[in-house]
């Protein structure tokens, strides 16, 4: 089992059975840094993955350095919005697992390194107030207290906090126009956000049948060159 986050630990659970009944249980955390021995079977499986020809195929080109959660999250959300015909898209910062993409060729393997979880993209219709509720809830999950958790495409937003707690949120289209209150907009997001971020909304999310990685690869293939614009979010403590 896995425990903690960012591969800090592996969790080991030992069960003692009497017949079909568990009579004792022992749990412990094993720091990954202490695990120095290599398993040849696992090593061979990893090598097979990295040698896969389809993963090393060039799918597009990065024209500028794309760095940090914001820049990379903008790429992910741009892809999910464009491929699914959504007005907006959100991506949790914790799902971005590399630091930057350098200018040059982009391969499918680089997409899987950036976004390795295989989450399915969903589309849900939300009002501006429901999106604000989502952003407020996301901040309570947020360990990056100096920045927002949810990266976005299709809009810009500013989250104002008081004593570290989310307060008011200002949202606008990139050209500065306000969103229409009460209107339902198509919003793309991954199924982790759908299941983990408990926020009030009236309409159910619908799966697209495609993972976020498949969606990003499709988007990059169609664009050939990528250079997402940033920043789109702000966090201000009042």
Q: Which residues does each predicted region cover?
A:
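Catalytic centers of hydrolytic enzymes
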Residues: 3-238
């Amino acid at each position: 089992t896995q425990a903690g986050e960012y591969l800090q630990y592996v969790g080991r659970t030992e069960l003692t059975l009497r017949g079909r009944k568990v009579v004792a249980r022992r749990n412990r955390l094993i720091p990954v840094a202490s695990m120095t021995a290599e398993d040849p079977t696992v090593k061979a499986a990893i090598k097979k993955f990295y040698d896969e020809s389809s993963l090393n195929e060039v799918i597009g080109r990065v024209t500028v350095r794309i760095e940090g959660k914001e820049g990379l999250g903008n790429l992910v959300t741009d892809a999910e919005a464009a491929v699914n015909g959504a007005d907006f898209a959100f991506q949790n910062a914790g799902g971005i697992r590399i630091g930057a993409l350098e200018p040059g060729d982009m391969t499918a393997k680089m997409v899987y390194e950036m976004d390795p979880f295989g989450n399915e993209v969903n589309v849900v219709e939300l009002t501006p107030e429901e999106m604000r509720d989502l952003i407020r809830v996301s901040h309570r999950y947020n360990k990056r207290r100096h920045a927002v958790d949810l990266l976005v495409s299709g809009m810009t937003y500013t989250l104002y906090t008081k004593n570290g707690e989310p307060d008011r949120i200002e949202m606008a289209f990139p050209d500065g126009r306000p969103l229409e209150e009460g209107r339902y907009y198509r919003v793309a997001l991954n199924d982790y956000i759908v299941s983990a971020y408990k926020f009030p909304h009236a309409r159910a999310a619908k799966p697209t049948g495609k993972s976020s990685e498949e969606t990003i690869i499709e988007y990059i293939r169609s664009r050939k060159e990528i250079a997402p614009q940033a920043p789109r979010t702000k966090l201000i403590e009042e």
